[in-house]
Structures are given as structure tokens and as C-alpha cells.
Amino acid sequence: MKNNKKISSIRIATTGANGKMGKQITRTAINISKIIHTSSLVRHKSSFKNYDIGKLANIFPIGVFTNDNIKDISDKFDVLIDFTSVKSSLEYLNFCYKNKKKMVIGTTGFNAMQNKLIKHMSKKIAIFYSENFSFGANIIFRLLKNISSIGNIKNIDIDIIECHHKEKSDIPSATSILIKKNILKNLKIKKNIKISSIRSGNIIGEHKIIFSFLGEKIEITHQAYNRKIFALGAIKAAIWLSNKKTGLFNMSHILNKQAKNFKSN
């Protein structure tokens, strides 16, 4: 649904306030004028309940305190930004569905049935779901639509190597699975694409696609140097949802709009 009205301030709530992404979104949101970070959630009976989220994110106090029950903050937010676990994310989604709240989902690891559920719920509320909120990674997805045609060459091997911190639970990463799907979708011949996963240290995220020929190879690599890129993407997603009532959206919608704006200028 199109809406050309000027976007006013958007009230966001976040989940996992004491987690890596929760803290990063707090640090990032304070510098974006359209965003009002009104509330943030932690796990039920968490020791981090009633913490100032600014202090929790290692910045200055901002007067917003954590809560462990989404029902208590229902009237305080327009869009929920969630980077937690599959179980928690589905619980938050169910609440948003029942209370007609918009939701940005950054959690990964959903199975096919859960993805169908997200799509079904988007008929009633606006949902923005992406396996990766980095603009660079999403540009790679687009590049692969063209470059993957080289996979039709007879003697070629295609490999994907993904590296993440040792606490990341889903193996392989949702991004690497999406990369594989994007390549296979554009191939005219069947190809076995291998994904190798590394979980080590505090690596934020690295994805490498290798096209190996006889005597040469092509590599495409995306490296995330900090979590701010994901936080910015998620906040832009919340802004995107601000004038949407229903529908399922992803980063390609934002990239398409940016491309149109670039052409018109």
C-alpha cells in the first residue's frame, strides 16, 4: 500500500536488550532522528530487568528501562525489532500478530513451516524479515543473479565458506543458504554447491563464494567488521514499515527504492 505522507517519529522496542545486537541497536538508534527508542525487553525474570538501556549498552543513561514482559510495553511501541532465538522470536511474533504491531525480524534459523507462518501472519500485520541486514551482503545477492551464469560452464566447482563467532548456533548460516539458493536459481544445469562453516572466536561474519575453473578461480567476499551495519539495516527496516499496514518485506525492497531514487536523480 502506497502512502506519500511524511513519516513522523517511529517508536521502536527491541528484544534481547543485554545481547550483542540489542546493545548495538541502542547505540545506533540514539543518532537517528526519526527513531524514538521507547522500550526494550530481556528474558523473563532476567537479572537485567529494570536496567537503563543506555548504561546496558555502555553509553550514557537515556531514561529507558528494560522489561521482561512484552504485555507491559504494548502501548509504548509501533515497531518491534527482534534479534533473539527462533523460540523467542515466534512468541514475540504471535504477540505482535494478536495486537496488530509491526515487526522487524533479524532472528535466523526458521524452518520451512515457521517461514510459512511468518508469511501467513504478514497478511494481517507488516513484517520485515531478512537473513542479513547488511546492505553489502544484499548487493552480493544481486550480483550473483548475473555472475552465477558462469556456473553453467561444464568444469567448474562452486563453494561457499562462511565464518562466524563461536556462539552462533545455526549452521550453516541463513545468509550462506540464501547465497546458495540465489546461485542455484540462475543455473541451467544441476550443480552441487558445498557450504563450509567455521565457528571461531568473535568473528562477526564473513561469507566467501568461490567459482573454481581449471587453472583459475573467482572469489566474492563479504566481511562484516562490526554489528552497526546490521543495526542500521534493522532500523531502516523499521522506518520502511512505518507507513505499511500489512505485507512481508525484505532488504530487496529498500534496495529497489534506492535504485529508483538514484535513477530519478
Swiss-Prot record:
It catalyses: (S)-2,3,4,5-tetrahydrodipicolinate + NAD(+) + H2O = (2S,4S)-4-hydroxy-2,3,4,5-tetrahydrodipicolinate + NADH + H(+); (S)-2,3,4,5-tetrahydrodipicolinate + NADP(+) + H2O = (2S,4S)-4-hydroxy-2,3,4,5-tetrahydrodipicolinate + NADPH + H(+). It is found in: Cytoplasm. This is 4-hydroxy-tetrahydrodipicolinate reductase. It comes from Wigglesworthia glossinidia brevipalpis. GO terms for molecular function: 4-hydroxy-tetrahydrodipicolinate reductase; NAD binding; NADP binding; oxidoreductase activity, acting on CH or CH2 groups, NAD or NADP as acceptor. Belongs to the DapB family. Catalyzes the conversion of 4-hydroxy-tetrahydrodipicolinate (HTPA) to tetrahydrodipicolinate. NADP(+) binds at residue 43. Its main location: cytoplasm. Gene3D superfamilies: Dihydrodipicolinate Reductase, domain 2, NAD(P)-binding Rossmann-like Domain. The keyword Oxidoreductase applies. It is an enzyme of class 1 (oxidoreductase). HAMAP family: DapB (MF_00102). It comes from the Bacteria. The keyword DNA-binding does not apply. Coiled coil: none annotated. NAD(+) binds at residues 16-21, 106-108, 130-133. PANTHER family: 4-HYDROXY-TETRAHYDRODIPICOLINATE REDUCTASE 1, CHLOROPLASTIC-RELATED, DIHYDRODIPICOLINATE REDUCTASE. (S)-2,3,4,5-tetrahydrodipicolinate binds at residues 165, 174-175. Pfam families: DapB_C, DapB_N. InterPro entries: DapB_C, DapB_N, DapB_N_CS, DHDPR_bac, NAD(P)-bd_dom_sf. One of its GO terms (biological process) is diaminopimelate biosynthetic process.
